[in-house]
Amino acid sequence: MIGTLTDFFITSALILFGIALLLTLFRLIKGPTTADRVVTFDAASAILMSMVGLLSIVFGTFSFLDSILLIAIISFVSTVSISRFIEGGHVFNANNKRNR
């Protein structure tokens, strides 16, 4: 009884996360500004991490947790890089005294 109830909730959560991911990907493509696209990319990566975590529960393995960490790192670095590009027009500052 508990197993079927758990399977039902995990399956329904995966379906809802899939729908949410499709909606965020639509917004990522259609977003009016670059800032909207950055926020949407961050939300899509969080949804993707949740889906991978649920799949890790379904398959009963810990091997997917490395991919969750990789998605989080890529999401963080890309969000910071794009935000710096929007703010100043460049990601790396060539006039920084620490680079000399």
From Swiss-Prot:
Protein name: Putative antiporter subunit mnhF2
Membrane-crossing segments per the record: 6-26, 38-60, 64-86
InterPro entries in UniProt: MrpF/PhaF-like
Any one GO CC term of the record: plasma membrane
Family to which this protein belongs: Belongs to the CPA3 antiporters (TC 2.A.63) subunit F family.
Any single Pfam family the record assigns to this protein: MrpF_PhaF
Subcellular location: Cell membrane
Any GO molecular function: sodium:proton antiporter activity
NCBIfam families noted in UniProt: PRK12657.1
Stored PANTHER family: NA(+)/H(+) ANTIPORTER SUBUNIT F1, NA(+)_H(+) ANTIPORTER SUBUNIT F
Membrane-topology annotation of the record: Multi-pass membrane protein
Quaternary context: May form a heterooligomeric complex that consists of seven subunits: mnhA2, mnhB2, mnhC2, mnhD2, mnhE2, mnhF2 and mnhG2.
Keywords, sorted A to Z: Antiport, Cell membrane, Ion transport, Membrane, Transmembrane, Transmembrane helix, Transport
